[in-house]
Amino acid sequence: MRHKHGYRKLGRTSSHRKALLKNLAIALIEHNKIETGIYKAKELRSYIEKLTTAARVGDFNAHRHVFAYLQNKEATHKLVTEIAPKYAQRNGGYTRIQRTTFRRGDASTLATIEFV
């Protein structure tokens, strides 16, 4: 049974899931808006909101914390210096998910996730 389980497995091993979320987060930070599957978007929202909250502090330790998750200098720098300061007065809710369409190949629901 999966009662009260904390996250979605997305049909992947833990290392594959970690790499997927890291790559989706980097893409979202670089492009400010991406289109992906609805369940990937919902998992990414949790992942990126925690990173954005940590990055709002803006000091060296925040840089280190975010870099430990992303392993990408450009994305880390952009999140800490450009994106996170915009949300200094906002307590969570930094992203928006909108269902868009169905994928033609397998009819799965797609959604766009973007920074508010």
UniProtKB/Swiss-Prot annotation:
The gene is rplQ. One of its GO terms (molecular function) is structural constituent of ribosome. This is Large ribosomal subunit protein bL17. Part of the 50S ribosomal subunit. Contacts protein L32. The keyword Magnesium does not apply. InterPro entries: Ribosomal_bL17 (IPR000456), Ribosomal_bL17_CS (IPR047859), Ribosomal_bL17_sf (IPR036373). GO terms for biological process: translation. Belongs to the bacterial ribosomal protein bL17 family. GO terms for cellular component: cytosolic large ribosomal subunit. Keywords: Ribonucleoprotein, Ribosomal protein. SUPFAM superfamilies: Prokaryotic ribosomal protein L17.
